[in-house]
Swiss-Prot record:
An annotated GO BP: glycine decarboxylation via glycine cleavage system
InterPro entries assigned to the protein according to its UniProt record, in alphabetical order: GCS_T, GCS_T_bac, GCST_C, GCV_T_N, GcvT/YgfZ/DmdA, GcvT/YgfZ_C, TrmE/GcvT_dom1
Natural source organism: Staphylococcus aureus (strain bovine RF122 / ET3-1)
Protein's name according to its UniProt entry: Aminomethyltransferase
Enzyme class: transferase
Function: The glycine cleavage system catalyzes the degradation of glycine.
Length: 363
């Protein structure tokens, strides 16, 4: 493995725990600690802990910070409060998704954008390029933050025992600042990438290992990127670089809820997104279940039963929860019909599949 890969503060901790390390977005990350299935099931049915410190953090501050983040982002950032975050997209002029991200309003003039690891530098440069007309400062503060995700149906009860705040009523994307966890000061966000209840914990980078080790003392399973991918795919959650790209809009990529082109404020890509909201996008993302043995991989062709190509697989795996072969695929809008049978070209075979809901959590 290349020695110039970036490492999170927990890299040596993974190695000491015997994790299998892989390259991901320029980072050396654990793909698994025990087995992907064990880790998947821990987060789906019990409780699992992920190191997501490779994610990027970009801070926007200054007098025009609120207007600037609205200009950059496709969702309505007027809905933000200092306790309510927002999932949104950074779009180009054609409405394509440069990145999907979560934005936190830390104060009236201070916003934290949490972006995908592989896109941090690209996003940062895009944001800098567009700040000219705004009185703002933009900083890449990724090297100041550690980030952990504790996920699963038992995560809330554990966190409630460990922090100095009541988290029992926290709803999706609500967050609290200044929470004490193992004597460290953290931002606690009710969010995640698994389709389960849970929290994302933002801490000073120097506190990351203390919190990680502290949580693992409570019979919590460490989980790697392999389980993170199968969990998010079962939940129908998109991965940027596969299900979302700079040539896929929020309406095509299944995140229409993150686009609000009817608001008064202008933002980059608004005219294209307004047209797609009103008239429909040319393509749409669907869930697939393969009806024959095989795995639908990214880029595999999707055809109608006559063999006409109508789209392609964007992500696919075997579901550890159900054992079924599941996928997300991008198809022409007019070809969509729930339950419809299609074909997927898996190597030299054409396998039958059917259109199902994107969220395929089976428990």
């Amino acid at each position: 493995m290349s020695s110039d890969l970036k490492q999170t503060p927990l890299y040596q901790n993974y190695v000491d725990r015997g994790a299998k390390i892989v390259e991901f977005g320029g980072w050396a990350m654990p793909v698994q600690f025990s087995s992907i299935k064990e880790e998947h099931n821990a987060a789906r049915y019990e409780i699992g802990l992920f190191d997501v410190s490779h994610m990027g953090e970009i801070e926007v501050t200054g007098k025009d910070a609120s207007q600037f983040v609205q200009y950059l982002l496709s969702n309505d950032t007027d809905n933000l409060t200092t306790s309510k975050a927002l999932y949104t997209a950074l779009c180009n002029e054609e409405g394509g998704v440069i990145d999907d991200l979560v934005i936190y309003k830390l104060a009236d003039d201070n916003y934290l954008l949490v972006v995908n690891a592989a896109n941090t530098e690209k996003d940062f440069n895009w944001i800098l390029k567009h700040k000219e007309k705004f009185d703002v400062e933009v900083q890449n503060v990724s090297n100041q933050y550690g980030q952990l995700a504790i996920q699963g149906p038992k995560a809330r009860d554990l966190i409630n025992q460990l922090v100095d705040e009541d988290v029992t009523e926290m709803k999706m994307f609500e967050f609290k600042q200044g929470v004490k966890l193992f004597a460290a000061n953290v931002i606690l966000s009710q969010s995640g990438y698994t389709g389960e209840d849970g929290f994302e914990i933002y801490c000073n980078i120097d506190d990351t290992e203390k919190i990680w080790d502290g949580l693992l003392e409570y019979n919590v399973m460490p989980c790697g990127l392999g389980a993170r991918d199968t969990l998010r795919l079962e939940a129908g959650l998109p991965l940027h670089g596969q299900d979302l790209t700079e040539s896929i809009t929020p309406y095509e990529g299944g995140i229409a809820f993150a686009s609000k082109p009817l608001i008064d404020a202008d933002f980059i890509g608004k005219s294209v997104l307004k047209d797609q909201k009103e008239n429909g996008a040319p393509r749409r993302t669907v869930g697939l279940e393969l009806l024959e043995k095989g795995i639908a991989r990214t880029g595999y062709e999707v055809m109608d039963l006559d063999g006409n190509i109508i789209g392609e697989v964007t992500s696919g795996t075997q579901s550890p929860s159900s054992g079924k072969s599941i996928a997300l695929a991008m198809i022409k809008r007019d070809e969509f019909e729930m339950g419809r049978e299609l074909l997927v070209q898996v190597r030299k075979r054409q396998l039958k599949a059917k259109i199902v809901k994107k969220n395929q959590i089976d428990k």
